[in-house]
């Protein structure tokens, strides 16, 4: 009986550990919780305040599809999406709007 309880506890702790690691890996990849089909509406809002809508949408959609995340608002807040924030051009400038 005691072995059964230990085995179940070990199984539960292992499962909990694997779920935690999975969440950390996802956060390291960008914290993306969006589905690719949600990118269009998120980027439409993100680019709604710019006068350069076409390039903004192009790069926002590219970034969203890679990172599965778009920062909230029309400007800034990139710290909420590390992948989106850290993707740079060859010149070192931000790739994502």
Swiss-Prot record:
Residues 1-27 form the signal peptide. Disruption phenotype: Early flowering. GO terms for cellular component: extracellular region; plasmodesma. It holds the Pfam family GASA. Six disulfide bonds may be present. It comes from the Eukaryota. Expressed in roots, root hairs, vasculature of cotyledons and hypocotyls, shoot apex, leaf veins, stems, flower receptacles, pollen, filaments, anthers and siliques. Its main location: secreted. One of its GO terms (biological process) is response to salicylic acid. It is found in: Secreted; Secreted, Cell wall; Secreted, Extracellular space, Extracellular matrix. Induction: Down-regulated by gibberellin. InterPro entries: GASA. Keywords: Cell wall, Disulfide bond, Extracellular matrix, Gibberellin signaling pathway, Secreted, Signal. Gibberellin-regulated protein that acts as a negative regulator of gibberellin-induced flowering and stem growth. May inhibit flowering and inflorescence growth via a pathway involving GAI and by enhancing FLC expression and repressing FT and LFY. Acts as a negative regulator in thermotolerance by resogulating both salicylic acid (SA) signaling and heat shock-protein accumulation. Belongs to the GASA family. This is Gibberellin-regulated protein 5. It comes from Arabidopsis thaliana (Mouse-ear cress).
């Amino acid at each position: 009986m005691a072995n059964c309880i230990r085995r179940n506890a070990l199984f539960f702790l292992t499962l909990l550990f694997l779920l935690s690691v999975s969440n950390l890996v996802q956060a390291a990849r960008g914290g993306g919780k969006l589905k690719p089909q949600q990118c269009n509406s998120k980027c439409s809002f993100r680019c709604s305040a710019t006068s350069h809508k076409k390039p903004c949408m192009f790069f926002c959609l590219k970034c969203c599809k890679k990172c599965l995340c778009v920062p909230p608002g029309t400007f800034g807040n990139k710290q909420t999406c590390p992948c989106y924030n850290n993707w740079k051009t060859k010149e070192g400038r931000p790739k994502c709007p």
